[in-house]
Amino acid sequence: MKIYFIYVTFNKLKNANALGAKLVKLRLAACTNVIPNIHSTYAWKGKIVVDKECAMIVKTTSSKVRQAIQFIKSNHPYEQPAISAFAASHVDKDFAKWVIGQTK
């Protein structure tokens, strides 16, 4: 089973923390990391926007990654959240075992 990292941005720290806690409680993620105070530049509705956001990294498995993404998308405050998932190419075996166990 592969380990995946999902990267997603939020407008508020409390939104990221609340959604992260739900993902862990539902066993869709083994753990989440929230990174505060990132600066994002993007085009939205014809304008260039520079905004303060926070980012969340979700640690999950190949068997839960699609469910986790759907849950994030359904519960995210943004109209179009930026959600990306990456398969980890090299993972410590003990960490992988822990992630798999936490998401069963």
Model-derived features: where do they sit?
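Positively charged, small/polar-rich N-terminal and surface patches that mediate targeting and assembly
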Residues: 1-104
